[in-house]
Regions:
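Cysteine-centered metal-binding/redox modules
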Residues: 1-148
Length: 148
């Protein structure tokens, strides 16, 4: 039996594939109807994570992830290990920021660099909660009710 380690589910750009519904559907069948409603093809489920398919994600518009290709060409595990870090591929964007964690990439890269991938995985639930539910407080960053 081939066991996937959680750190193998961290993409080079630091998106955690192990927290994605496309991956989680393998253990959570209740997600399947929701994913199908959003246009995901049944034969594309579950997604094994980007490292398992060498960045050839069926859920991307172009087929292969440019960030994955770049990391592979530069021979780095994570983008922060690259001499060109940070680059525009990791630049935050407001587009779909309310539903996708893409704007976490820079923070995640810095966190992995300083604390390691295992600590990043442990911190992810708080990071996602702070990103999706936090309220900006000038000079303090995103705040949660329990921070007050």
């Amino acid at each position: 039996m081939n066991t996937i380690r959680p750190i193998d589910l961290i993409s080079p750009c630091a998106i955690y594939c192990g927290g994605c519904s496309l991956y989680l559907v393998k253990d959570r069948p209740e997600l399947k109807p929701i994913l199908l409603q959003h246009g995901v093809k049944e034969e594309d489920l579950p997604c094994p994570g980007c490292r398992a398919v060498d960045g050839h994600c069926k859920h991307l518009d172009d087929g292969q992830c440019e960030q994955f290709v770049c990391a592979k060409e530069k021979q780095v595990t994570y983008c922060h290990e690259c001499d060109e870090f940070p680059c525009n591929r990791l630049h935050p964007a407001a587009d779909r920021a309310d539903s996708l964690p893409h704007n976490l990439k820079m923070f995640a890269q810095c966190y992995i660099s300083k604390h390691g991938p295992e600590a990043y995985i442990a911190k992810l639930p708080e990071m996602r909660k702070r990103y999706f539910a936090g309220k900006i407080s000038y000079g303090k960053g995103p705040r949660l009710p329990e921070d007050e």
